[in-house]
Amino acid sequence: MARAVGSVRGQPSRLIFPVGVHHVQRLIELVGLSLTQRRDMLICVLGTVSCLRVGEVENLQLCDLKWGHDAAWHSDYEGTMAVGVYKRKQDQVRKLLYPRVGSSVTNRLRAFVEELGLEVSDECSKERAPGARCRTCPPVFPRTVNGTEHSRPVSRQQVTNAVLNSLRMLEADTTHFSGLSMRRGGISAALVARAPEPILFLQSGHGSNNAARNYTVPRNPHPL
């Protein structure tokens, strides 16, 4: 609503920076973090490399994580994974999209999940209804990580806070960052790397450079 009112009044949109590749590289190397800090760091990193929206991070369930998804095709992909996004803005017919995630992020996420004792339910419904939310599997990112109650997912506000908390771990100024910074960072990195349009679609859901450019911030702003 605020964005719509602002456009009518001719006000510029709020400046939002992307989570950069340099942020992701530094975050994934952090050690000595508490469980809550690790959850926040992984939200920020996974959300960025998978080009996820805040609501998509909130909706992630353990059965959406496809460990070793591409390993059967080539051994180089052992230790990586895919993330099943069961509901995406551009996926009106629920074909699902599976952004790929490299081994360094996969290893950290798997260790986090195992430490919390999260497991896919024996009654998981994803195989029967892959385009629907599972009623039995736990969230990837629980609202609370202390104790044994992990059935409630993080809220959207917690996802946004996780991005800001992660950047504060790097002593970054968070004035111009928000939950949107994850998706903006992933798409920006893909376009700067000149990823082909089909690859951009598979990772982010955006099927055209015209649509993706709304999220794009160049890695080097000097030419601007």
Regions found by a protein language model. Give the residues of each.
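Extended, non-catalytic subsegments within catalytic or DNA/protein-binding/adaptor domains
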Residues: M1-L224
